[in-house]
Amino acid sequence: MRVLSDQITMQPNKQNQSTFFDLAIAKRGSSNHVLATINRVVNFTEAEQLVAATYGKGGRPACRVGVLLRVMILQHLYGLSDPQAEEQLKDRLSFQKFVQLDAQEAVPDETTICRFRQRLIECGLHEKLLGLLNTQLEKRGYIVKRTTLVDATLVESSRKRPDVKAAAEGRAPDADASYTRKYNRSFYGYKAHISSDAKHHLIRTAVVSTAKAQDCHLFEQIAPADTKEIYGDKAYDTKANKAWMRKHRIRNGIEKKGAYHIKLTDWDRRNNRRKRRVRTHIERIFAHLKKWQFYRKVRYLGLVRNQLELTLKAVAYNLKRLAGIMQMQAK
């Protein structure tokens, strides 16, 4: 599948300017590497055009848009900060190949990476990146819309909690983080809400809220209306969510919640166990994000920046998952 075109980056086309060193780099690396697989099968052209259009004719980024987009993905695949991303790009040929950095080009520094991230936020482009990728995955048959899973998880704030001493020292508080309780423990931070397809466990939607937000109130934001059935835990069992599913003719796979005046029958409990066997697969996605993509704690302050972080982590997760699926299919 065709990869990024230099034409849309508002810089001279380097297609005929390859050096001997470029050709040598191109031959390095394994063809079944995750990054090589992503580069081979995913087309970033539309995403690059979307970002490049925001610069207009009068300005351009210090580095090619395609390079910076791929740097964002690398950061969220491997949990790299801006300084770490700059350092790793200087040292690792596999990273240079993935971002398509030519031998003549300088590695983007941490300031350039930070400014590019800020542009994505200011232009609202981060909201479209996951959708652009998923359109490609759907066309290739990897996202199956029939069954959708929904769930949420708590993520710690980068600030432990509001601190009078820290505020006096000039350190900014995290105004959008909030307190909640889980398992009788106090928690301060945010909540990540996602939906995924049940077959290949690819993320379809991803939304960040403050920690105290109730899962059921975010249901309509993460539940796609084009699915046939939705599975989730008891937190989503509300009249409003049931009405929304009936309106869109979606089969209700939400576990039934009992109450002090409504006792669950034996059939209800058996049905809940059946639904739980389906919906628990989404918990593996959160486990992967927290262990391998370092999402136990958010990196930024505020909902907007942390929404970008979750979106890019979802993009990176889907790309890594796609590479894994393709490798299994090739065996």
Walk through the language-model features, giving the residues of each:
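Polybasic low-complexity intrinsically disordered regions
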Residues: 83, 87-90, 100-104, 108-248
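Phosphate-backbone recognition surface of nucleic-acid-processing proteins
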Residues: 97-114, 252, 260-270
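Secondary-structure capping and boundary motifs in well-ordered enzyme cores
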Residues: 43, 60-67, 105-108, 274, ...
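Helix-centered, glycine/charged polyanion-binding patches within enzymatic domains
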Residues: 228-229, 234-308
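Basic, short loop/linker segments at the boundary and entry of helix-turn-helix/winged-helix-like folds
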Residues: 28-73, 77
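Charged, often Cys/His-bearing segments associated with DNA-binding zinc-finger transcription factors
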Residues: 1-45, 325-331
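C-terminal domain-tail junction helix/linker
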Residues: 309-313, 320, 324-331
